[in-house]
Curated annotation (Swiss-Prot):
Gene: argH
Compartment(s) of residence: Cytoplasm
Chemical reaction(s) catalysed: 2-(N(omega)-L-arginino)succinate = fumarate + L-arginine
Pathway: Amino-acid biosynthesis; L-arginine biosynthesis; L-arginine from L-ornithine and carbamoyl phosphate: step 3/3
EC number(s) on file: 4.3.2.1
GO biological process: arginine biosynthetic process via ornithine; L-arginine biosynthetic process
UniProtKB keywords: Amino-acid biosynthesis, Arginine biosynthesis, Cytoplasm, Lyase
Principal location listed in the UniProt entry: cytoplasm
Protein name: Argininosuccinate lyase
Enzyme category, top tier: lyase
Amino acid sequence: MSLWGGRFTKISNTEFDSFNNSLRIDHRLIKDDIKSSIAWSKILLDVQVLTKKEQKIIENTLLSILKKNKNNFTKILSSNSEDIHSWLETTVINTIGDLGKKLYTGRSRNDQIATDLKLWCKRKSKKICRRIIQLQNDFLDNAYLHINTIIPGYTHLQRAQPITFSYWCLAYIEMLERDRLRILNLTQFLNSSPLGSGAISGTSWEIDRKKLAFFMGFSEITKNALDSVSDRDFILDILSAAAISMMHLSRFSEDLIFYNSGEANFIELSDSITSGSSLMPQKKNPDILELIRAKCSSVYGSLFSMFSLLKGLPLSYNKDFQEDKNHLFSGLDIWEDCLKISSLVLKNIKLKKSNCKKSAQLGYSNATELAEYLVKKGISFRDSHHITGKIVIASIKKNKCLEELDLLFLKKYCSKIESDVYQHLSLESCLNKKNSIGGVSNKQIKISLDQVKKRLSTFK
């Protein structure tokens, strides 16, 4: 049944219907459409459109429809309804007769869909927050396992200074914490109810919009009906949060792809999360990580598509909005999936500790410590930097680590170098000197781990 057929003298073209209908996309809003409809029935009771008995019949009918269809969309999708709103209205009327027609008094699909989308975003954001927290816990588990596992830290993809795998995990925990906080910050925009705004200018029924908002779990109401039905900023906000978080997951994937490569050979991915080559039998490919990296671009596409969709629209509602759900659902589904898969990856990696440490040593990542040692011997940092550079060149020619060079050889470059230099050049010493807050020292890492553990324990 069409919700707007009374104005027209001809039935709509079937090709137009196929092009115009959105049920195949927005059927996912059934929980939210029913939640907002139940709230609306309660407000209609307040303004005496419905009796107490009628409201209860409608509410029970809606709950029954939800129970039958919330986990199985087959019946919904077999319908020829235009969208989830018209499907629900038709189903209610077919179930309880003319009483069902009263439910839509004073309400437009314009404020209805704006409300449903906010309700859906609130539900989805809670699920994503749980995924983020789970991934943080998986990083934390790895961080505790590898407090003493030394790996090279990189700048410009060149070995720079030694760090630990634990420290690397902590870096991603912090990125994910910002992602979680971004979602929490969105609640101020998702917590205002547009329902009661009507088509564009409000409703003539004297409804209590604040009470209506409370019924649905909103903390406040929108202030302007024209803006309320036009607003899709909250979709841009949540997709922006998704895009930033996916960028973090893409960087995580790139790190592990490199660590897994034959050139680095720091980690091994489990057979259960890798694939092979149809031609080259020796291959064990990190497809799972490459797909996370690739799917980042899909989420960017969802965000940019929403910007493009909205940029030229006049106030207020336009049919262009029908496409917003494609971008919203796709972007957030990918984000949630990638968070889940990232957790799977962290449960299926094995570190090659000796390879990691050897790479840190041969990368001369302790060169900065040698330069700082010379500064403490009274040499200016610039001269110390120059002397250390010369020693590194000599080490490379000898194919030795700095700590493997004998004292007489080192003294050729600076007579102030003494036997105590070796205690400064060990990678463990390099790490533990970085004892500033947030540094890589064993002490600071343990402090950070305890702080993260305490923070995450509040969500259990």
